[in-house]
């Protein structure tokens, strides 16, 4: 059983900081003076006077970018000029110069009168190299900072771009495919390709009227696999399958509709599904997981051999993946693999995709002392499901560092399967593994805007902390009420 995705540099750039001379004692004296100067500036603004002078002048916000040698005390000397000219500094950032490796560039957002600013610039010219004056706020844009990083979607609607970059369309069948010589089947596959390629984020997923033969094929797969699930599937799978029968029409005589499944998953775990025309690259497929979006095929395998398919079809997606995507812990595990892939190098994405393959596609877990399957490739393949839980299978403990080196086999049973005690354990191991990924920033999924925020400086991190603080306040309030109720 082939998984839902299988086919397949980023460089470091300088991190931006708030100070280049933070270890110099003289800085603390300067920063103290600057703080005092800012307070004086505020008082003078209230009285309408220009700092240090008797006349009044209109202050306005402006900015300057200058470069200086990366040496101890260099920043202190430059910033002292701002103090001497009574220029109020609102924000400071630093980064390595793109012009000379031995220099750094300083961005200063400030507030002052025109006269003071011109005098400041003249003094700065003697100590620094002026790069630009009064630049736009986005002088150091994220686009510029990420220019050496592989593109990834920053908002959920940009998954349209990922979904349409199909490597192999559903109509391109190999000569050994059961439906290769079936022109009617090939035309049907073309229909599903057109549906998927025409889909855009926010639209309801088109409902498909499956043919009698397609429904019959689905029915055979559903019936035979259902016999194995009680003794082979994990408890999370067994918990959700009856719910899918109740709310999404999982029956032997009915092929479920992706729109119904997507709405069900949204309520259970926050995941949704969207149609896809064929194979995606690992990078594009994993990017969908970062947004809790799973790309699903809608076509059904060829009816001549219902228990075999050389590619992922809707039987694989609906019976293998969906029941576990409805589990919140499994959903979180899936999303974290996706988040780790964003902006990662091709080599790291390959490693993550291999870990995905041997967990979400072919993973095993221990429950009540017994091996159980949670991988979709197993739960949608009768032969391999039996094999993986038999004495003939080679089972190893899941360790991302070694698992990522295991060869992924497509047309035969795997040489090895990997077992975890729980989804939580697998998730923690993947978190530790993700720390080794070469990526000079972290990412945060904002569930309110369904966008990815890049955490690379104190301001971006502060925004996340504010959200966490709000959540913690809610938890603390709930605990206090529980304690009051219990009389603690």
Curated annotation (Swiss-Prot):
Residues with Phosphoserine modification: 19
Cofactor: Fe(2+)
EC number: 1.14.16.4
Tissue: Expressed in brain.
Region (Disordered): 34-60
Domain of life: Eukaryota
Record carries keyword Phosphoprotein: yes
One GO MF term: tryptophan 5-monooxygenase activity
Keyword presence, Transport: no
Enzyme class: oxidoreductase
NCBIfam families in the record: Trp_5_monoox
Family, per entry: Belongs to the biopterin-dependent aromatic amino acid hydroxylase family.
Record protein name field: Tryptophan 5-hydroxylase 2
The species this protein was found in: Mus musculus (Mouse)
Gene transcribed to yield this protein: Tph2
């Amino acid at each position: 059983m082939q998984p839902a995705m299988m086919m397949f540099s980023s460089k470091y750039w300088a991190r931006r900081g708030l100070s280049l001379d933070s270890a110099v004692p003289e800085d603390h004296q300067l920063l103290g003076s600057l703080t005092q100067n800012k307070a004086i500036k505020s008082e003078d603004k209230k009285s309408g006077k220009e700092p240090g002078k008797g006349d009044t002048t209109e202050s306005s916000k402006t900015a300057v970018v200058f470069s200086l040698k990366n040496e101890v005390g260099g920043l202190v000397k430059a910033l002292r000029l701002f103090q001497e000219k009574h220029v109020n500094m609102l924000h400071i950032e630093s980064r390595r110069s793109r012009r000379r490796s031995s220099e750094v560039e300083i961005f200063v957002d400030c507030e002052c009168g025109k006269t003071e600013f011109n005098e400041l610039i003249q003094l700065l010219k003697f100590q620094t190299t002026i790069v630009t004056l009064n630049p736009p706020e986005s002088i150091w844009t994220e686009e510029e900072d990420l220019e050496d990083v592989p593109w990834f979607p920053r908002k959920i609607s940009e998954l349209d771009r990922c979904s349409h970059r199909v490597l192999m369309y559903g109509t391109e069948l190999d000569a050994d495919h059961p439906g290769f010589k079936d022109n009617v089947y090939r035309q049907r596959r073309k229909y599903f390709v057109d549906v998927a390629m025409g889909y855009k984020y926010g639209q309801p997923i088109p409902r498909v009227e499956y043919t009698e033969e397609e429904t019959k094929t689905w029915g055979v797969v559903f019936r035979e696999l259902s016999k194995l699930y009680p003794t082979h599937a994990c408890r999370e799978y067994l918990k959700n399958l009856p719910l899918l029968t109740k709310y999404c029409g999982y029956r032997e005589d009915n092929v479920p509709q992706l729109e119904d499944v997507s709405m069900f998953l949204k309520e259970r775990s926050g995941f949704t599904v969207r149609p896809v025309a064929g194979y995606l690259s690992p990078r594009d497929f994993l990017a969908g997981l970062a947004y809790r979006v799973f790309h699903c095929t809608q076509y059904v395998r060829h009816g001549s051999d219902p228990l075999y398919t050389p590619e992922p079809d809707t039987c694989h997606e609906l019976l293998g993946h969906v029941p576990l995507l409805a589990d919140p812990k499994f959903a979180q595990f899936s999303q974290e693999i996706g988040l780790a892939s964003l902006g990662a190098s091709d080599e790291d994405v390959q490693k993550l995709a291999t870990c995905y393959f041997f967990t979400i596609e072919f993973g095993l877990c221990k429950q009540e002392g017994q091996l159980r399957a949670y991988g979709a490739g197993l739960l949608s393949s009768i032969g391999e499901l039996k094999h993986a839980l038999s004495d003939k299978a080679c089972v190893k403990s899941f360790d991302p560092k070694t698992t990522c080196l295991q060869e992924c086999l497509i047309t035969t049973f795997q040489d090895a399967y990997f077992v975890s005690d729980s989804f939580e354990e697998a998730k923690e191991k993947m978190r530790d593994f993700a720390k080794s990924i070469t990526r000079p920033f972290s990412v945060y999924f904002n569930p309110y805007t369904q966008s990815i925020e890049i955490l690379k400086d104190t301001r971006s991190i502060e925004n996340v902390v504010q959200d966490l603080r709000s959540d913690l306040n809610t938890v603390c309030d709930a605990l206090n009420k529980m304690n009051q109720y219990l009389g603690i």
